[in-house]
Amino acid sequence: MNSFLLLDHVSDSQDSGSEWSNTHGSLISQRGNEYDGITPATKEKNQNKLEILNNETTIGSTKSSVSSLPELNRNVSFEKSDQNLAETKREEENKRTEVFKKDAEHEAVVVKRDFRPRRPEQTRPYTYDFLRHQIEFKRIGLVPITVPHGFSSDRSITSKSSHKPVNVIVRNRASSRKPPLTSTHRFRRYGAVISDSDDDESNTEQDHSKESNLNTADNDLALSSTIEGKKTSTSKEALESESLLSDSDQSMTNISSNSTVSDLNLKTLKKRLRGVLPPSFLTLQEKKKLENRGVKKKTSLHKSVIEGEKIKGVARRKLHPRSTAKLSSELGNEISDSDNSISTPTPTDDSRFDTSEFLDSISRDNGWLKEDVVDQLWLPKRSLSALKKSSSLTSENPFQLNVAANAVSTIPVYRTTKTKMKKNRFKYVEVEKLPDLILESYGKKAPKFLRVFARSSSHIPKMIRRKRQMDSKKYFSFDKESDRQVIDQVLSDWYSGKHELVQQSHSYKKPSDSKSVGGNIFSVNSKKHSVNINAKTAANNGLSHLQNFSEELLKKRKLFSSLFSNNVSYKKSKKLKRTHTVHDKCQKVAKLDHYIRDNIELNSKEREHDCYEGTLAVPQVNTEIRKSSRKQKAQRFIRDDFDTVFFQSSSNPNYFTDVNPFWNIGIWSTTFNVITFRPGLSLPNNSFIKTQGLNSILQLDIVTHPFKSVYAFSCLFNIQDDVFKTFEKLKDTFETVLENLPYFTNSETVDLYNLLSFCSAFILHSQVSMGLVNLASSFLETYALVNDRVSSISGLNRSQLVEKIAVLFQTFQVVFYCEFELGNQQNINKVSWLASDLISKLLSAGQSGLLECYRNLRIQASDTTVIDTLFLESWSILNHILFHVYKKKYALWEQVNSFFDLQKKELSILEMEKIWYVIMTLNPVFQIGLNGTTHSPGNNSFWPLIIRVSESAFKMHKDGHNVKVVERYLRTVFLRIHFLISEWRWEDVAQILFLIFDFFSHRKFNDLSSEISEDTPTDFPDFVKSLDRPPNLHVTALDTCFVIYLKVILISISRLRQVDENTNSIKRIVSRLQPLHSRQYTRESPFSIKDFMSLEHTHTLLICLYWAAPENCRPSLNRIRDIVIVDNSHLKARLISLKAWLHLMKYVIKEGTDYELAQGMEWFNSILKVTFDEYLALFSNGTSVGEMQLAEYSKHQLENALIVAFHSLQDLIPNSSVYISRINVLVTEQSCRRILKDSHFFPPRVTLECILFLKKFLQYQSNTEPPKVTVVGSTSHDSQDAYFDSDVLDDNTLILEQEKFERKYEVAQILRTFVSPFLYQTISYLVGNDEDKENYIRILLLPLMECMAICASFAVEAKINDWSYYIDFGSESWERIRNTPLKRSLSTTFYSFLISYNDSFIKKHEEKVLTVWFESLGALDEDHAAQFTILLLQKNLKNPILLNLPISVKIEEISINYFKSVHLNLLTAVFCNMAKLYADAKTNGFASSQYLQSLFIHYLSSLLSSMQHSYETNGHSSDTHSLFVINSQRVVGDILQYCSQFANDRNLPALRYFMDSTKFPQPPERLEYTALRLRSYARKTLTNSASQNALFSFLKANFDVALLEQKQTETSNLLRLAMGFHNQNSSSKWDVEISSLRKFCVKELLLSYLGEGSLAAMFYSLLLLEGLSRTYNSFRRIYLQPYIQQLLCEEISVFVADLEKYALLYENKRPLLSGRIYYLISSFVAISMTNKTSGLPSSLICNLQNFLARIARDFLLELCWNIEGSEFPPPYNTVDCRSKFVKTIQQHCSADWYDNVTNIVHKSRKKKLVLPSQVEQEEEYWSGLMEVTIQIWKHDKGFLEPELDRFLNVICSYAPDMSGLPTKIKCFLDKIGYSWMTEENDFDIVLF
């Protein structure tokens, strides 16, 4: 392959730093001895020879070979004394000076005839190395690396000065083998200190640009004069040399020779020295700082910072005049001025190195165009971020712009002083390890001079090296104290960052010479004809930018920060070497590259105002459009995350990024950041193509040529003028152009472009219009000579604009010869040769210029010129000319192909990348049309290059070279091919498809090894899984190479299908890409991951071909099916075949034919049948344990396969929005009937998947409707039906309904055959078989019942069956299933499915639905009732019992939790609606009320039966059970309250269960409901015997329950709730009915029980007395209004006397009964004596009070008689107060109880009730009497005054023996507050 730099990202050599190699440089022999410079005698001769050398130099020949520094003498005696060292040094210096002079004279007289003169870079390689370094640093705004000079004599001389002694440490110098310099040297002057600022990390990228060529003889002369160093210090040349050497004097080079500004310049230089800070001051300040702190910094090797030794700058120590004179005399030079003195360093010792000479050469050399990262290491305490921005000095001259002055470090030298050294407080760096550190950090070698020095210093003892980096202990003394103060102030300001910039002098004149491309070019005059080339003055448009830029940089500097402050030491970095990848290093280099390019571009505008005469010309910096930080970051992200950005340096076209590290880790760009143009972009309006100039040339039409008259170079050119004069004028203009070509600007280049365009019209006019073929031929010959000279000039001057001009000349040469040969109809070989040469030139120069043209074209800026798109236009011209000449659309590609050397068998990755880079970058060229406008990509394919590269890549992979990297590269190749076909629309893809197919076929269709993962299973690509819709063929990050290849196939065939003529091509491609063998994977053979992958990829390839190819070209389904032979095949192979069937059937069902659909279902049935047979065969095989385990494992695997099969069926069913009529084919015997019929053999998970498939299928059929198709009516106008407009609409409706009916009938028949009977069989088996597995079975039953409901709906709508067939007693009826708890719990679910899928069911069977609804409501704690209720409400059922339900939210917002909260309220509302409906029906007619009563009782029976079933089945200890009991009690209470009119315990047997306390717990609210019922009897007429008997029965029932269950308290509470005033406040009204009830209970019932006399009656009486006592006591807790008290007293007065009689009657016989009567009477006392002060009581109340007081007085008298021992009065013997209900009472008492002597026994329950003992009864009796007496005594003691006094007197009389008083008397005394009487006290003091 041609040895050229094709890619912008390919470097010439792998080395870096300052080592460059070139072709011609290697042929020149190196001289044995080196000369110090070129003498004036040989100057002119060297110049001429150098021109000859430059003419022979090809592109890139100026890369010099930089030699290393002279070796340091290793034989150093460190033990010499200072005196001996000084003497030896002087002797060696004298000897070296003599030898040097002799060699110089010999060089002047010797004439070299055999060899041409050595070039400067060959003569002085070190100087030239530093020259490049200095120029490059100045270009980017940095101070070059240098060391101070000026003290070349022995240090001991200064000791003789009259000044104060200065403590100077003698430094040993390494000697140089060269003789001393004879030329004069100027001192290196430092610029003022300026501000340093950190910048963003993203901008710290280094530019690795290469050196520039010596383009002109003047430049060579300037270099020679620079190296020679003339002695004329006051001459113009010396001043200019001074300007060149000093970085701050660049603006003084244009001073006129006639000017007398030499003295002014010298004064200016003197003034500038004031305030300059030498680096030695930094050392002093640092020392002072550490001493002030008093803290010793501990240095660490791992955290060392390169701390170069601080040396002095131009602010030197003041010397005595005698010392100065002696110094100058020893040096042999004249010292004319302290600033401009010329000194020649004299070496003192062979063992010392002359650092002054060596480092002084750095200040003069400014030709190094490469900034080396290593040089920055010499800057002490300077971080890399501080180098990002440069500042300028403040100057009154707006044109003055200075660069930053960096701190300087010296090269460490030996020190032999014997003084005691202080401990080094500074960080230490090992210089010998610096090159390795640079290599590790930046991936490039250090400069050779640093490597040589490191190698030499490695032999110096370590202690000496460390001492060299310590403080020099320099102390400076000054003649004046003011100087000391100034220096101290400068130090303080410098270190604190407050040091102001130095104002420089502006006594010189502004540059007046014109600015040119090189930056320092004077006006050029032609020799014959004066062609005015407009030279731009200094007042350029860039001036404003300079002023703004200088203002921005006038900032204060910041504190110094070390360059390695954020780095680690060499030792630590060596440890990190293993973790840092090459990619990380390349990223660092890339960042530095961006930084350097930005700085060079920024400073290039500054240097346009500097004019040099006789100096090196700085190469032209390309001014590109600055990208914003956002775009730079985006570009970096794309590079780091997706592609590698390959770019050419915008500042130097010779620079190429080295991407070998990227390739070593497998990173390549896919697109090279080249994308298609959008249509409509156009070249500049004045371009040759846009103006139809090229089109007129190709058509040989001079009339349409746009450049028949142009104005260029201040001359007018017109084809109407005399052609011969025009020809002479053109020749003169060309000559002028050649003379001034290096100094061209864009404007002159545009004039040249127009001139060459006119030349094309001139040739066409001369040849075609005038027939002057010889004249055209002569012009071509002249132009060829001009083109050759332009090529030579461009080889010397490597500026970008000159290269563009060279390309412009060569492009128009192709145009000229094309029109000449087309006009003469000659052979076109000359055009082909010229085009080939131009292509070679364009490709050899790199593609960065073309890419820049692409960017300019996309921007479409208004200021875009033809120069900005020149390379693109050149390529486009070549394309159109070659296409016109050869009539081939790929003619340009053939020329490019011939440029490559592709004859060898194998290509390296670098060579392949070169080809790819060219292909990608040339693709947009074909989008430019003859009109200069871009069009859509296409018609630019050329596959031979791609095939050659791909074959090499495949061969490399086959050979196994670096497999990982090669596989990554293969992926990049596939991505690029996909990109070419998809985006660039390359055609004729058959060959590349066949090549890739052969590659994968050889690999058995396996993925690459890097793409195979054992953890990640393979699967079909995503676009294959969705063939029913247009696939996404864009490449994703997860796509493998094979998937990318499949997408390429799909794109290619899809485009071929767009043209009908490509059918044969498609057939050929499809037949060629099909695998030619079937795969047999038996069950016995192992199945590896590669087999799985191979089989999957084979199916995928055939599926893609089937989908992409037309119907007559695609492979058949049987062909795809036969890839795997199903019988006896491996299960995994069947699974792959099944998945392939699934993905393929998605397309076949939608787009395939009926025959293909049948083939597909046959394929599926065969797989399913074999799997079923294998599964069922496992049940009968195997008897041993191992065989059984193997059978279980096989079953599990087969079950998984069946599940996958049914999943595949489910995936084939589309959404309901898509109507597909052929979906019915999925329901077959194998897919449904067989598994439902044998469901007991298969596990539930397999059966469930089958049911889910059926459910999805049935739901799709029920929810999908065929699309509406309007049928145009064919009714004739003569028919009478034509007058009706709705006939057509009716016909359409009928046709649509008929189509729906036919579709449903077809589905119903299929379901009837394969599904419905087997579904019912499975449901019946699961529901009625095993109730223990309810939860296990419910998972299957729910989808089964849903499918059954849908089947029933289809059968009813198809009129095959009626609803009764499924809900009554048909063969598939729900009622025929065994009535199990599981069935009852699922009834509502089944009916919910029926209602959901068919609205007609709820309309025809509303009563059945409501019955089921009440059953669901009975399960109060289950969720299905809520779902069923929500469903009924959603169906908007218009039943009156569902009106006004307590639901406060919308129906669609009802949730289960919300329904549970309103469940009971909803039942209450339903019961109210029933009561209202029944009441309305009863008023209307008896018949309707009877119907409603029977219907409502049926509903309530269903409700209560469900409640009873739930109560009996649930547990009796859980919280759920307790909640259910509470809810059930609430429901029963609501039924009793609201539905008592038509439902009771007689006609509603289920109600008895819940009212029986022995069977169901009664609620606490039962007393309230019972009290309400008791009150209801009061509302009735109690005079009626029926009502009275009902009341007797009700009370007796409650009394019996209380006696049997020991619930006497509940009965008392019942009576109190029914007849008391517990809820009545003071404003309550008198309830007459309740008062009558109380009277009836006391007078008729209680007195009857008391008069009956039996034991049973006595128990009833006790319960009734207790209840009545609580009832009347309840009146004591509220405030009674007077009239209510009056009425109560009237009520009591009726029966109080009778009660007293019975109390007296049973006083002896049954004292318990008497005591209870007295308790009742005590309650009367509280009522009668309350509120007596509110007014005068009535006579009734007074009588009542007196009657009650009499009872208490009698009791007191009885007590007195008891104490005195008197006899009691005779009691009442008989009481006759029986009522008319005595017989009824007797019957009630004897109905359930029979009496014994002391107890009673219940007849049925055998419950025995025993009376308390006699003593207890007596106590109860006395307690009752005492309660009556105490109540009266509390309310009014006046009623008991006489009797109470007597009683107390009797007690007092009984004082002698108080202990003998009865207990009841003591208790009474205690209650009335006289308990003290019974205590042992002195009764003499007691007064009554």
Curated annotation (Swiss-Prot):
Function comment: Involved in protection against replication-dependent DNA damage. May act by restoring active replication forks, repairing unusual DNA structures, and/or preventing aberrant DNA rearrangement at arrested replication forks.
Compartment(s) of residence: Nucleus
Region Disordered, annotated ranges: 12-34, 151-258, 316-354
InterPro entries attached to this UniProt entry: Mms22 (IPR019021)
Protein name, as recorded: Protein mms22
UniProt entry tagged with the keyword DNA damage: yes
Ranges annotated as biased composition (Polar residues): 13-32, 212-227, 338-348
Family statement drawn from the similarity comment of this UniProt entry: Belongs to the MMS22 family.
Domain of life: Eukaryota
GO biological process: DNA damage response; double-strand break repair via homologous recombination; replication fork processing
Listed GO CC annotations: Cul8-RING ubiquitin ligase complex; nucleus
UniProtKB keywords: DNA damage, DNA repair, Nucleus
Phylogenetic placement of the source organism: Eukaryota, Fungi, Dikarya, Ascomycota, Taphrinomycotina
